[in-house]
């Protein structure tokens, strides 16, 4: 890869003035060779493999950050879904495995570890059910472990038994962790991807290599600055500006990923070029949409503006790297985006509008706080709605929702750090309890028959 001096100067400006960073270098680690019928042996094997494969990740990231002057905010680990790896133990709880993941991740200094996960889009094995029922206690007793559940896909339909259990799991987690914080580490997916470097939904897919490096970049501030400084008038010209900016962002991520791959002697997997916001002013996806001409994010036209942004980011990234993967689009996590927080507090950005936006953007309903008395079946209904959008449109959708115990609409909750803070948003008054309790499976749509 040849880098021109002009690109270097542009990158310096992006970092210094526009909050550009490499959000994460994530090592995916396969744990199939750790399997044992003895859960204590399994835990020791898992600890040994993670601390061996990941031991140099943090030092490598610091070296590359200093060498290129680009902040690398997080170093993370993702592992094979634990429901698969722990099945042979026949244990009635996998909390000890979550605690092992936590211990191993802390030992090597990473910020998060993902993969306390179950893939149940078509049905739940006994091990899947044990894992999901272990999630609340696992989130309570660990600090940096993330959990995900894939409850649907375009090929399989939606597993409504798993949707019901996921809603109950989130509700229980909210009840036993301070201000529901444990729920910030749980994602429920439809069409989950196997190479996602972002938390909380990262896991290492079964079709992946023994270890692989996946990189996530982030540059909402860069895109907004590019639009502010351009003379684009029509939306066609706006799309072109975004596309060219995404190209530049992706080039930096590609460079960091391939350098990390060489230093760690681990294959480079994918570059996820999602625009991931932070609560910092100047690092907001919502403000990009407003720069296009919306008075406030969430008003009419927001979904169209987001569709333009998401598509232009993908097109620019594809030209800059042959290894684009993961989720690659625009994230809309309410608590992590200063502009979305403001729009939600103003009452313009609602749960319904966010759901519409998820039909055209990178993932789904993300980091949304709801009242603590929201019933489990309502959470399951929200998950089912979001999964339906993903299933029908053959895209990844997800829900990361936090019922905040003791809080109601109009209150706010502080999560801190990259997770920011969120106003508590209302859920619908009507009940979907009978619908959710029917269980079974929503059949795969006609779009699933592609062969």
UniProtKB/Swiss-Prot annotation:
<protein>
    <recommendedName>
        <fullName>UPF0210 protein NGO_1297</fullName>
    </recommendedName>
</protein>
<dbReference type="Pfam" id="PF05167">
    <property type="entry name" value="DUF711"/>
</dbReference>
<comment type="similarity">
    <text>Belongs to the UPF0210 family.</text>
</comment>
<comment type="subunit">
    <text>Homodimer.</text>
</comment>
<dbReference type="InterPro" id="IPR007841">
    <property type="entry name" value="UPF0210"/>
</dbReference>
